[in-house]
């Protein structure tokens, strides 16, 4: 019998198998430290223990409004790290990002502008009221804001709320005898950024100085996972509300999240209002995924002869 030897191999050498380098994602509420604000390339490489090709770009432009006019925009990245001791051993570094536009925030028909006072409180007033520094009166009474207010930049409210929670700044009002009154030392409650115009020039000293006031403080952040149309997943942050580190009741945070999601916000992001945990996508059960007839070719035990049947 004729003996036939065949060499049937066309493989590259491949790579040595190593440990799984899949990036983990997390959901839940976690206390975090703030490590840096808008760091440069060298600082980012040290924070993330990696090498970067390009310098980070924090300044840009966005098109807004029906007329698509361009407005200068700045991204503010607060690099944060979870407190592993309070997160079941989970430790990771990520960022909380804010976007500030170089324009004041108006309502849709441009009849009202958002204003912010020196205690970080906001309200909506008419343009005429803003010019006169009037306190607007709502159905339930006057707005909870001081006359010393100014127009707020688009995105400033969320940024201010983050800083107030991080610095653990108290409320300027207290409830006494069924009435809200100002605290005895309102100066301890001041919380307003005054150099935002400098951010659009690349000067972030004010923010770095603010964080340095309490370098060991923590703020609680709600993390989630965002899924893109091509099924890629990214770590996300709910930046509409932040909690002081001593807060353990998350009901207001959950209510705020549900209200915004009901209005159409965060449609592709999954949040879990609770303890921080690793995000786990349920695996698909392929053991009974279809009958043999659904396959593009016959099953192994019923298949015909292979076209490479060299034994014949």
Regions found by a protein language model. Name each.
Residues 1-312:
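Short beta-rich binding modules
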